[in-house]
Amino acid sequence: MSHSLAEHYHEILVGIGENPQREGLLDTPRRAAKAMQYLCNGYAQDLHEVVNGALFESENDEMIVVRDIELYSLCEHHMLPFIGKAHVAYLPTGRVLGLSKVARVVDMFARRLQIQENLTRQIAYAVQEVTDAAGVGVVIEAKHMCMMMRGVEKQNSVMISSVMLGAFRDAPSTRHEFLNLIGRHN
């Protein structure tokens, strides 16, 4: 854990008028620094190391969907969490990605300061890169604490973002099948 990061959290406590020496806050700077490093550990990860060769030969050329992948990220504007789920689909062309690796790719990009729109795009292009799929579709649904806890304070709003590549973009029937499979009927 970065000692300087803990020192910055100490200064934040002072800056908001708290006493970092009171009993409940004595270890808070260290704990907050450790938590932030964990929440941003995606910067230290490499896509090909995350996938770790988990690509398997397959004759399947039908859609593969992994839906409801929980995700937690921090918005780059306020450093507040957004929490939701990702739905990832692709059309394989001879190779399929290990199931857990789809979730790990989501986590790798979610564990960075980001906006949801970019997160959606990064996941889609990463899956495309490692699988060489005929198409990739990603939909993310998330609640943003920066909108719930401050600003307009809207508790029930959900942001939905999507990125469609290849056949998911070019073929309405492929896109429609994906959206039906994840319960997003259009």
From Swiss-Prot:
Q: Which positions carry the signal peptide feature in this UniProt record?
A: none
Keywords, in A-Z order: GTP-binding, Hydrolase, Nucleotide-binding, One-carbon metabolism
What EC number(s) does its UniProt record assign? 3.5.4.16
Name the enzyme's class.
hydrolase
Which pathway or pathways does this protein act in?
Cofactor biosynthesis; 7,8-dihydroneopterin triphosphate biosynthesis; 7,8-dihydroneopterin triphosphate from GTP: step 1/1
Q: What's in the GO CC field?
A: cytoplasm
- Could you tell me which PROSITE patterns the record lists for this protein? GTP_CYCLOHYDROL_1_1 (PS00859), GTP_CYCLOHYDROL_1_2 (PS00860)
Task: List the GO biological process terms.
Answer: one-carbon metabolic process; tetrahydrobiopterin biosynthetic process; tetrahydrofolate biosynthetic process
Q: Name one GO molecular function term.
A: GTP binding
* Known catalytic reactions: GTP + H2O = 7,8-dihydroneopterin 3'-triphosphate + formate + H(+)
Q: Which Pfam families match?
A: GTP_cyclohydroI
InterPro entries named in the record? GTP-CH-I_C/QueF, GTP-CH-I_N, GTP_CycHdrlase_I, GTP_CycHdrlase_I_CS, GTP_CycHdrlase_I_dom
Fill in the subunit field for this protein: Homomer.
Family affiliation: Belongs to the GTP cyclohydrolase I family.
Under which name does UniProt file this protein? GTP cyclohydrolase 1 2
